[in-house]
Structure formats: structure tokens, C-alpha cells
Design a protein with these regions (language model features):
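Conserved beta-strand in the GNAT
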Residues: 71-74, 138
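Core segments of cupin and vicinal oxygen chelate
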Residues: 22-70
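A detector for short, charged/polar N-terminal pre-domain segments
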Residues: 2-12
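Vicinal oxygen chelate
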Residues: 2, 15, 24-28, 85, ...
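Generic structural signal for well-ordered beta-strand positions
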Residues: 43, 137-138
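Histidine-centered active-site/metal-ligand motif
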Residues: 19, 60, 89, 140
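Short, flexible turn/loop "capping" segments at secondary-structure junctions
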Residues: 10-14, 81-84
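A short beta-turn/loop motif at secondary-structure boundaries
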Residues: 51-55, 80, 118-122
Length: 193
């Protein structure tokens, strides 16, 4: 990171966001979504006996979405945002040339979404959707060509609510296959380390 990336007057510096946590009702069911739909890779999982012994606070799995971004999916029965809230949400930066492909990909996986749309004057394009636990997500493209032709927000949040259980029955086997392959790679790496 270049020194110009930091506030020169700050006595200490933060290099990057290491990870973020998201509350979910079932860590492996949530991981299905983050691996199958968002292309994440399983990074770690907590052992239930560590929670029982008080060595870990809750059951969780970690999914790495890209270099430098890990999402820890913590099991808890509260904390998911209401469907009609905009915040908090997690914005994921995607390549401009892939935004339309993301729309097709979300449709394939039966994920309700809104967009692409823009926020007036930003030059960006966004798509909004929820994970199956109701956590709000955004796919974001800065400097999107043709942004001025896109509808401007705010969007109708009702359009991002999952009306059916996810994954849909016809996609469940594929989602499970992707998750199992990712879990096997993670466990192999842990054994070889």
C-alpha cells in the first residue's frame, strides 16, 4: 500500500479490512449461498467441542470471497436486519464488464435482486439482494459506462426478499456439491499445513 493511501497526520494506520462477521441461523446452509452464488471458498470452521469448552464464542465458518476479504458466518438466532432496512449492508466490488453476467448468475440461482441501478451523480452501478438469512448485500461497479441510462435509487426492498426457501430444490444438489468440494479443499489444506 502506498504511503499516500494513509492519513499522513494519523499516528497509526489501518492497512485493510481483515474480515467481517455476519449473523446467520445455520452456518453451513449460509455457506451454501456464499460458496455457490458468490464463488467463495471455505477458509475455516469452528469445532463444536471448542464452543462447549468455552474456547470459542459461537459456531462459525469462514468463507473467503477474494484475496483480503473473509466473511465469518456466525450462528445466532438474532441480529439479521429487517427486510425494509438499507443498513447495514455489505458492498462487494465487481468488475464493470461482469455486472450483467452477475444479473444472469443471480437469476440462475433464483436470488431476488434489484438492479443494475445508479445513485445520482456517482457514476456507479449497483445491484442489491439479500442472503437467505436477510443480510443485505450489494454488487458495486465504480465508473460504470452508461450509468446515466440506469434507473436511480432508492429501490423497493420488497423485491429482494426471498419468498421461497433457498436453495431451491432444483439447485440444492449443485449447491451442496460446490460446498462439499470447497470443504474438502479446506480440510486437505489444514492437514497438509
Amino acid at each position: 500500500m502506498a504511503s499516500s493511501d494513509f492519513n499522513p497526520d494519523a499516528p497509526l494506520h489501518i492497512r485493510a479490512l481483515n474480515h467481517t462477521t455476519i449473523p446467520v441461523k445455520d452456518r453451513y446452509k449460509a455457506a451454501l449461498f456464499y460458496v455457490a452464488v458468490l464463488g467463495g471458498e471455505m477458509h475455516h470452521e469452528s469445532a463444536p467441542d471448542r464452543v462447549k469448552k468455552g474456547l470459542a464464542r459461537s459456531l462459525q465458518v469462514g468463507v473467503r470471497l477474494c484475496a483480503g476479504l473473509e466473511i465469518d458466518l456466525f450462528e445466532q438466532n438474532y441480529g439479521q436486519p429487517a427486510w425494509d432496512q438499507s443498513h447495514p449492508h455489505h458492498a462487494l466490488d465487481v468488475p464493470t464488464e461482469e455486472l450483467e453476467k452477475w444479473a444472469a448468475h443471480l437469476k440462475k440461482w433464483k436470488v431476488p435482486f434489484v438492479g443494475p441501478m445508479t445513485r445520482a451523480g456517482t457514476g456507479s452501478a449497483e445491484m442489491y439482494f439479500n442472503d437467505p438469512d436477510g443480510n443485505h448485500l450489494e454488487l458495486h461497479c465504480s465508473n460504470y459506462p452508461g450509468h446515466e441510462k440506469l434507473p436511480a435509487g432508492p429501490y423497493d426492498k420488497r423485491l429482494t426478499v426471498h419468498k421461497q426457501p433457498w436453495p431451491p430444490l432444483e439447485l440444492e444438489a449443485e449447491a451442496n456439491r460446490l460446498l462439499q468440494a470447497s470443504l474438502e479443499r479446506m480440510r486437505r489444506l489444514k492437514k497438509s499445513a
